[in-house]
């Protein structure tokens, strides 16, 4: 099929306006092809830098005065680049298939992206039980609190070196573990 570049840009604007509906449709349609395992969901956030001189200016609506934040903003870059960045967060299911994503200006806190994207994603699921898995940078108290309600839980990595002595001892303790199948104690070997 032949189509104009301008047509694809117009389509992108239309798609952006219905992004959440489209993601829900993709989830449901793919679930009919391959059973999606959303019992464990992994989230991570990264950023992309642009080799430009200045960040984008925010857009101010002349009629309403509403300010829309531009995407390419100065923020903390994982590549340590002194360039404007855009942040992207991605949820994947237990098989590594993407579930949802968010794109935010580079100067936004990535932890806010996690909870807002998860709330949207949960609305798409029939089975609301899930375990949120992320690295330590995405395990704030607010995120852990959010994932302690309902039938949600969380696993967030933590540096063993930064733990208190009693917790370090507990981590390396080989006793006190129980099998889920029959609740019998089983030492780690």
Question: For the regions a protein language model found, what residue spans apply to each?
Answer:
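Anion-binding and metal-coordination hotspots
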Residues: 1-189
């Amino acid at each position: 099929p032949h189509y104009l570049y301008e047509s694809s840009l117009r389509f992108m604007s239309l798609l952006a306006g219905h992004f959440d509906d489209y993601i829900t449709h993709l989830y449901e349609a793919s679930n009919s092809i391959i059973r999606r395992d959303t019992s464990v969901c992994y989230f991570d956030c990264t950023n992309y830098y642009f080799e430009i001189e200045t960040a984008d200016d925010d857009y101010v609506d002349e009629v309403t005065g509403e300010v829309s934040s531009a995407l390419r903003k100065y923020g903390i870059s994982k590549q340590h680049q002194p360039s404007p960045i855009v942040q992207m967060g991605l949820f994947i299911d237990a098989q590594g298939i993407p579930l949802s994503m968010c794109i935010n200006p580079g100067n936004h806190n990535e932890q806010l992206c996690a909870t807002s994207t998860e709330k949207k994603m949960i609305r798409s699921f029939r089975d609301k039980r899930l375990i949120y898995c992320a690295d330590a940078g995405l395990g704030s108290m607010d995120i852990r609190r959010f994932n302690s309600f309902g039938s949600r839980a969380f696993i967030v990595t933590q540096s063993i070196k930064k733990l208190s002595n009693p917790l370090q001892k507990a981590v390396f303790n080989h006793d006190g573990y129980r099998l889920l199948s029959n609740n019998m104690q089983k030492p780690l070997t």
